[in-house]
Amino acid sequence: MEEEICAALAAKGITHPFPIQALTLPVALKGQDIIGQAKTGTGKTLGFGIPLLMDTLGPGEEGWDEDPAAGSPQGLVVLPTRELAKQVAEELSTAAANRTVRIVQVYGGRAYEPQIEALEKGAEVVVGTPGRLIDLMDRRVLDLTHVTTVVLDEADEMLDLGFLPDVEKILARTRTDRQTMLFSATMPGAVVSLARRYMTQPTHIRAQDPGDEGMTVKTVQQVVYRTHALNKVEVLSRILQARGRGRTIIFARTKRTAARVAEDLGARGFATGALHGDLGQGAREQALRAFRNGKVDVLVATETWQIGRASCRERV
């Protein structure tokens, strides 16, 4: 690994690789395509982020002046949600702290102008959601013809959200000799089919026990409480009163339920925030900041936002 990346990670206390990173890095650094099957929280971002950054040149770095594609995106990371895009971009920026590589986030729910301006100034790595990436390509602001590394993260979620056709459009606009890394917690048929069409002899890496089919890592303790729908808030209140529970995320199936539960818990005296699709992007980011900063310690969210991935890494 490059000294600059190692030093940047060491400054954040990252000195040893997680299992998915130890498995991924030797293969990815050879430029091979990878299908990584790993759950959330296993550290896969640096598993693909470090090879991506090492294959990218920033302004003023050795070889930059001779690169005919200087200033154009060389790396692309596609994710299903804004929150995940922000999280991954922040992790890549941490690893690239001692480099001049410019990392630009593009996602919906925000004005086009700042994102267009950032791309026009030059971006070596673009991290974004499928819809906004396609919009910017259609506006001829985003050129992916020089991208050498593509990462498809949380591919099964992109399938669930109906984004795979958009992902195929994006891949079709990149060069055929690119390196492609696909990561997914599960491998439904549509994701496998996508990999077969757009990847070249990929190495399959599985960072979990073959017999472990659960969606969560083994360190997550799971408990089921059976209760009548009318008593759910009361039961939640009693659970939340547990001593030393720390910050808590409650997932709800619908936007209406998330809003109602947050309101009911707030009325019972809990510092509660809500996060769902009826809120604007600014309101969602404000709710996440409040949760990270401890202003609220209970966050009620719809399942599609997957806040456990994007909010914080401390105890939840």
Residue ranges and their predicted role:
Residues 1-315:
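Conserved helicase RecA-like core
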